[in-house]
Amino acid sequence: MDKKVARIRRASRARHLMREQGATRLVVHRTPRHIYAQVIAPNGSEVLAAASTVEKVIKEQVKYTGNKEAAAVVGKIVAERALEKGIKAVAFDRSGFKYHGRVQSLADAAREAGLQF
């Protein structure tokens, strides 16, 4: 089993548990150059808030989009957008990625901005 397939299997197991609980999810996806975050409704069919390093607003704030500082900016902005919509508590869906580095920076920034995991 290769690395990508293993990550996708881990992610699907975690998502299954979150669906059973009926939780609003903060989903993170990362690539070597960018990081993306979305707040998804409990039914899984609607994106309630989103932010990523491909947005012009975020690109202007950071020098490079593939580091922890950029991930922290994305976490702060997605949390602010979720709070504007009245979402205070979410389940953190790391999409099978290790809770380390950019994924951890995004989560910490979202918590500091007011989201509860």
Swiss-Prot record:
GO MF term list: 5S rRNA binding; structural constituent of ribosome
CDD domains the record matches: Ribosomal_L18_L5e
Keywords: Ribonucleoprotein, Ribosomal protein, RNA-binding, rRNA-binding
Gene Ontology BP terms: translation
Any Gene Ontology CC annotation: cytosolic large ribosomal subunit
InterPro entries hit by this protein: Ribosomal_uL18_bac-type, Ribosomal_uL18_bac/euk
Lineage: superkingdom: Bacteria
Pfam family, one: Ribosomal_L18p
Similarity field: Belongs to the universal ribosomal protein uL18 family.
Role noted for this protein: This is one of the proteins that bind and probably mediate the attachment of the 5S RNA into the large ribosomal subunit, where it forms part of the central protuberance.
Quaternary data: Part of the 50S ribosomal subunit; part of the 5S rRNA/L5/L18/L25 subcomplex. Contacts the 5S and 23S rRNAs.
Name of the protein in its database record: Large ribosomal subunit protein uL18
